[in-house]
Design a protein with these regions (language model features):
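N-terminal cap/lid segment of alpha/beta-hydrolase-fold proteins
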Residues: 2-39
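Short beta-strand element of the alpha/beta-hydrolase
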Residues: 41-49
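The serine-hydrolase catalytic nucleophile loop
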Residues: 50-66, 79, 217
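Conserved alpha/beta-hydrolase
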Residues: 64-86
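Alpha/beta-hydrolase active-site loop
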Residues: 92-113
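Hydrolase active-site cap/lid region
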Residues: 134-185
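Short alpha-helix in the alpha/beta-hydrolase fold that links the catalytic acid
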Residues: 191, 215-225
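Short beta-strand/loop motif that positions the catalytic acidic residue
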Residues: 198-199, 204-207, 211
Length: 241
């Protein structure tokens, strides 16, 4: 009901259609929308989860509108194999390739819009949690906000098996088969790397305690890693999903 009656007119802004390539990869074009409301303001890269409509998901559009209303610039784009961006595989790689897309977005903002390192933040929702790998690799990303994010790839397979009523011991073979289909090991990189080298860069975690698909254990493990490294982490865990 809230979506049916929600007035979006206050959150509609002029945007620029943009395109760029992943860092270190040519031949793949990523496409998105850039909104600049203040040339002196910082910018946030938005990272979507599933399904395939990517940046067009209602929560992505609303987030971009909220950021603009608050005077913050934003870049929302489709990861590879989503939306209007190029397709390079029949399978997603749960962040193992996609983190390079985020680094490409960062590079584009630095080179084309003249942002300085530290002026670029990043948000990620659900399966977009692989963005944390980009945060781990690029110290110029000044802050990270994760909402119900997948931060442990083997764990999310285990979560899904349990949700569907299958034995959790299939998780290991599932990860291996998924990597074979995607053409990359799904455990080669981990979003948890970001908790090890965040330093004093702020990280905000929010998660539903009863999330039926991405268990709160993802965020809690990330939080524990950050605390053990004396990092700057803030959490908001809600009772309902």
């Amino acid at each position: 009901e809230i979506r049916k009656n929600f007035d979006v007119s206050n959150y509609q802004y002029q945007y620029e259609n943009v395109s760029f390539e992943p860092r270190g990869e040519s031949g793949i074009t990523l496409r998105g929308w850039y909104i600049e409301v203040d040339p002196n303001a910082p910018v946030v890269i938005q990272t979507h989860g599933m399904p395939q409509n990517g940046k067009c998901k209602p929560e992505m559009l609303l987030m971009q509108g909220y950021l603009a209303e608050a005077g913050i610039n934003s870049l929302s784009f489709d990861l590879r194999n989503y939306g209007n961006s190029d397709v390079d595989s029949d399978y997603i790689s749960i962040g193992q390739k996609e983190y390079k897309d985020l680094l490409g977005a960062y590079d584009w903002l630095i080179s084309e819009k003249q942002y300085s390192p530290g002026e670029v933040g990043m948000t990620a929702i659900s399966l977009g949690g692989g963005a944390a790998i980009a945060f781990a690799d690029e110290p110029g990303i000044g802050a990270l906000w994760l909402d119900s994010a997948v931060l442990d790839f083997p764990l999310v397979i285990k979560n899904e098996l349990e949700r569907l009523g299958f034995p959790s011991f299939f998780a290991g073979p599932g990860v291996r088969v998924g990597g074979w289909l995607a053409g990359v090991s799904l455990t080669e990189r981990s979003p948890l790397e970001a908790a090890e080298n965040a330093g004093d860069r702020p990280v905000f975690l929010t998660h539903g305690k009863e999330d039926p698909r991405v268990s709160i254990q993802h965020s809690q493990t990330f939080e524990e890693r950050m605390i053990s490294n004396d990092a700057n982490v803030t959490t908001w865990y809600v009772e309902q999903r």
